[in-house]
Amino acid sequence: MQNASLASIISENREYWTGRAASYSEVNLGELATSQRKKWSFCLRSEISRQFPDRAPSQIRVLEAGTGPGFFAILLCELGYDVTAVDLTPAMLVEAKKNAGPLAGRICFLEMNAESLDFPDSCFDVVVSRNLTWNLPHPDRAYIEWARALKPGGLLLNFDANWYAYLFDDEAQAAYEQDRINSAAQGVGDQNVGENFDAMEDIARRVPLSDIYRPVWDLELLSSLGLQAEADEQIWKRVWSEQEKLNFSSTPLFLVRARKLSGASAPGYSAR
């Protein structure tokens, strides 16, 4: 029953995010129109430059897993990287291409499941993702695939949070409710309630990461794959807007940063 439930999540996710594509695109456009654009661009450039200090962006091939309406793909293309962006939902890719405007022709947008990449081994220098792994039915498979697609010496950057932990933990539930109170008191719109919110909560109850403490889980898995992994649990302070800090105080964004060691040949990301 559990396996059947997880298998259905792929189609449910596609259906849900098809319905959310337009409104989620508006959220991304808002980020592109504010200081978030500069904050995130600086963050991405700094992380990648630290790993590849002597290489020009045009020589660095980047994969974004779960691009959604294209926020990261657009920023990375503006920074000069060679960008491929994949998403499970065709409607999201339509929004991403639209949002990219004249940059769309420089970004390779592909419909693809982040848990099963249609790329050869060791073909990307960097893999990036934001707010995706929590929503996956098999996040371990996604990490295995991302590690496989990374070149030796490559960099993985995954920005995520313990979204929906409040469904399983009383303390997290109380903190979540306090976020709602604080946001209302400050006159800030509640970003935690989107279209068809009940449907997403239903999915969140069934995906494996909602009741697992992260990023500890991520670091343990990546280390088991032979990657050198660490977490930055203060990244939210540098990239979130004041509105996001109020809305999501109880679920701060973290960054999982992992490096595939040069010459590594660890179980889990060998050729399929």
Segment roles from a protein language model:
Residues 63-65, 69-116:
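Class I SAM-dependent methyltransferase SAM/SAH-binding core
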Residues 115-126:
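A short acidic, Gly/Pro-enriched loop at the edge of an enzyme's catalytic core
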Residues 140-152:
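A short glycine-rich, Lys/Arg-flanked "PGG" loop and its adjoining helix->strand segment in the class I
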Residues 209-226, 231-232:
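Short alpha-helix
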Residues 225, 242-272:
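Core SAM-dependent methyltransferase catalytic element
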